[in-house]
Amino acid sequence: MQYVTPDLCDAYPELVQVVEPMFSNFGGRDSFGGEIVTIKCFEDNSLVKDQVDTDGKGKVLVVDGGGSLRRALLGDMLAEKAARNGWEGLVVYGCIRDVDVIAQTDLGVQALATHPMKTDKRGIGDLNVPVTFGGVTFRPGEYLYADNNGIIVSPQPLKMPE
């Protein structure tokens, strides 16, 4: 499904929160949306690896990496696995790598920046807890919509206006 965040903001101004404009679009999908699943981790993508291995149909994985610009929380292998398992997209408050391959993957991916160094795998992090960055709190079970204009969050699913 194609989402246009300005149209959603115009149609649902009382429902949406707009994430501060700090993310770049790296994925093969220009727009994506779905139910939020969250991970809170810092320079350790063990939980990201576990989650992309699950059924993600209709879901967006929001990864709060603490804004770290020192390690990549997502690379081509995890992005390809997420796409195979039906994830709509990922928003990474941190870095990703292998961006040329990710750009060809049928997956929405927004992140702060790129970094070539992978993370450690210590199994540290939290799954499905509220996370806050960009002026918005992302709660599991709420909805996220993203495109080249930005990222918005809603407590309920939104329909594109006709």
From Swiss-Prot:
Record note on cofactor: Divalent metal cation.
Reactions accelerated catalytically: 4-hydroxy-4-methyl-2-oxoglutarate = 2 pyruvate; oxaloacetate + H(+) = pyruvate + CO2
Required co-factors: a divalent metal cation
GO biological process, one term: regulation of RNA metabolic process
Transmembrane segments: none
Source taxon at top rank: Bacteria
This enzyme's EC code(s): 4.1.3.17, 4.1.1.112
Binding site for substrate: 75-78, 97
EC top class, as a word: lyase
Cited InterPro entries: RraA, RraA/RraA-like, RraA/RraA-like_sf
Alphabetized GO MF terms: 4-hydroxy-4-methyl-2-oxoglutarate aldolase activity; metal ion binding; oxaloacetate decarboxylase activity; ribonuclease inhibitor activity
Keyword Amino-acid biosynthesis (UniProt): no
Alphabetical UniProt keywords: Lyase, Metal-binding
Gene3D superfamilies found in the cross-reference section: Ribonuclease E inhibitor RraA/RraA-like
Binding-site positions, a divalent metal cation: 98
Family indicated by similarity: Belongs to the class II aldolase/RraA-like family.
UniProt subunit comment: Homotrimer.
Protein function: Catalyzes the aldol cleavage of 4-hydroxy-4-methyl-2-oxoglutarate (HMG) into 2 molecules of pyruvate. Also contains a secondary oxaloacetate (OAA) decarboxylase activity due to the common pyruvate enolate transition state formed following C-C bond cleavage in the retro-aldol and decarboxylation reactions.
Protein name according to UniProt: Putative 4-hydroxy-4-methyl-2-oxoglutarate aldolase
Lineage: Bacteria, Pseudomonadati, Pseudomonadota, Gammaproteobacteria, Pseudomonadales
